[in-house]
């Protein structure tokens, strides 16, 4: 048991290291656009999240948009969609609740969901799981801050101004799910993309690492 714990600590330290973060960064940059062809969007142009969200909504003719985390409406106010719901407990959006509170009471379904709330692995994981429950058929889930540039940008608790949190850990975990197709695009600190369909590029790592 002690050996197992020792190995787990080593793996966690390795996954948090600068080298592995850089490896993830260039892996996503090189390979992940292949599974996104049906969106008819070139993520290699490195557009910002507003351009990406609006372009996808327009090309897929989405009608209902949900945003989790709307700080100062930097994105929410400029998204062009017929029906918009923005959830934030502090500022922005049009629903003043935590994402957990919102999902517990929500009965609506959405075509496009953008997650940019609390940037911790545990909360992002919950936000993804809850979003899947309310995603319309053919819809898409997008996440911000999936590719931190260095160790300090993802350190939790936060230790510097520019902070992506450990959102990337949730992306890695959901890439092991057979029923979800997950990608990360090299744009705007990493835009995660989740489709509710069979995984086309399953990430399989040893069970003892989970």
Sequence positions of predicted segments:
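A short alpha-helical cap/connector motif
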Residues: 1-114, 118-210
